[in-house]
Amino acid sequence: MALWRTSDSKVYLPPTPVSRVVNTDEYVTRTGIYYYAGSSRLLTLGHPYFSIPKTGQKAEIPKVSAYQYRVFRVHLPDPNKFGLPDPQLYNPDTERLVWACVGVEVGRGQPLGIGLSGHPLFNKLDDTENSHLATVNADTDNRDNVSVDNKQTQLCIIGCTPPLGEHWGIGTICKNTQTQRGDCPPLELISSIIEDGDMIDTGFGAMDFTALQATKSDVPIDISQSTCKYPDYLKMSADTYGNSMFFFLRREQLFARHFYNKAGAVGDAIPTTLYIKGAESGREPPTSSIYSATPSGSMVTSDAQLFNKPYWLQRAQGHNNGICWGNQLFVTCVDTTRSTNLTISTLSAASASTPFKPSDYKQFIRHGEEYELQFIFQLCKITLTTDVMAYIHLMNASILEDWNFGLTLPPTASLEDAYRFIKNSATTCQRNAPPVPKEDPFQKFKFWDVDLKEKFSIDLDQFPLGRKFMLQAGIQRRPKLGTKRPLSSTSSSTKRKKRKLTK
């Protein structure tokens, strides 16, 4: 006999619905008006390994290395205060204008080259690739002068908010955990904003070397007291609104050139079950098992360049399809294929000695970089419905403040006092304090500011990137100036005479 019974399994309840993230194409209307904007030649020069502080009358020399991030903060004009070719383009009562980045080209000057980095006191115990007998790990200074050609990187990230980077740093120790001096600290993956001048991953890992390497000699001197960051592609790709990364270009390559081990007491001893004890000196106890490799970026070539090329943004990887919120754009660049360091020598003695005497000369090293930024912006408009304004306010409330949206108070009919002289001791102190200027949310971060507020042009055919865009988009050039040549009166009269004769 069949008997029906209820299911013993748990009842499935659907998840609570969440608010849907809207793509910018759903509430942004693109117009057919395009503008070109380009920077001037952007130059920077300094010492490739460290900054030199002020000493006496000498000015400070900054640290400028090819292994630093260049984060350009591009300031754009407010399109709502822009002189438009068509005044009937939008209704300022119900609409607002924004910029959309549709084309970009990052130009790089200077020749291709490889710049070395290193440390005059590098912690190198043994050459573990070609070693015959291990060196006894005694309390002797085995540091040596070692130079390397770092990992080769080309990178370009475009977004309207600063890029994010990740690195390993010291984590938090639990309260119930007992630690002793010299123990390995817990590690934590830290995500932070990438600033201009931050060091990239040069092949030794993305970590806080200041806090995690007490010897100050395990890596080259340009990163021994720095934090190397690697772009947090996973977090930027998962950004809710897609503002930090519209798209990115990346090319990395390296190989291991030399293999060393580190001098010092090994914190985590090798278990005796993993080897058979030796008898000779250097084999019992075993020497250092802390191995590391020096990176090499290998050959640089013009066939694998990401820069000096135009890129067109048709569809961004996130929900923001190139809209420049806040009238700003962040361009993050790395290019180690032009890392040549300039060596400069000066005569310090009264005259040059013969034969050659090295102490008569001083040696200096500098590194210079050259950039140029070019953009194509499309003018767009947003219809300010209730849903759109609520969505933008949830994303970034300062956008509506920049659009001058707020509560308008009704005019008052009461009589108010207005003093003529207010900044003197005879007049009572005024209650109304001066308005506080708007705080920049990124003022505590360091960026390379590029002002393009007065460098917009609608004549695309006057600029190289503009002509490339017109060819790509199929836009016709404007007709040439001038009037058509009128037909001469003599030719017309002679034609009439010929017609009469034929009759």
Curated annotation (Swiss-Prot):
Disulfide bond in keyword set: yes
Biased composition (Low complexity): 484-493
Source species, domain of life: Viruses
Chain intervals for the UniProt region annotation (Disordered): 476-503
InterPro entries hit by this protein: Capsid_L1_Papillomavir, Capsid_L1_sf_Papillomavir, dsDNA_vir_gr_I_capsid
Localization: Virion; Host nucleus
Main location per the UniProt record: virion
Keyword terms: Capsid protein, Disulfide bond, Host nucleus, Host-virus interaction, Late protein, T=7 icosahedral capsid protein, Viral attachment to host cell, Viral penetration into host cytoplasm, Virion, Virus endocytosis by host, Virus entry into host cell
GO CC annotations, alphabetized: host cell nucleus; T=7 icosahedral viral capsid
Keyword field contains Disulfide bond: yes
Protein task: Forms an icosahedral capsid with a T=7 symmetry and a 50 nm diameter. The capsid is composed of 72 pentamers linked to each other by disulfide bonds and associated with L2 proteins. Binds to heparan sulfate proteoglycans on cell surface of basal layer keratinocytes to provide initial virion attachment. This binding mediates a conformational change in the virus capsid that facilitates efficient infection. The virion enters the host cell via endocytosis. During virus trafficking, L1 protein dissociates from the viral DNA and the genomic DNA is released to the host nucleus.
Assembly information from the UniProt record: Self-assembles into homopentamers. The capsid has an icosahedral symmetry and consists of 72 capsomers, with each capsomer being a pentamer of L1. Interacts with the minor capsid protein L2; this interaction is necessary for viral genome encapsidation. Interacts with protein E2; this interaction enhances E2-dependent replication and transcription activation.
Protein's name according to its UniProt entry: Major capsid protein L1
Lineage: Viruses, Monodnaviria, Shotokuvirae, Cossaviricota, Papovaviricetes
Name of the gene encoding the protein in the UniProt record: L1
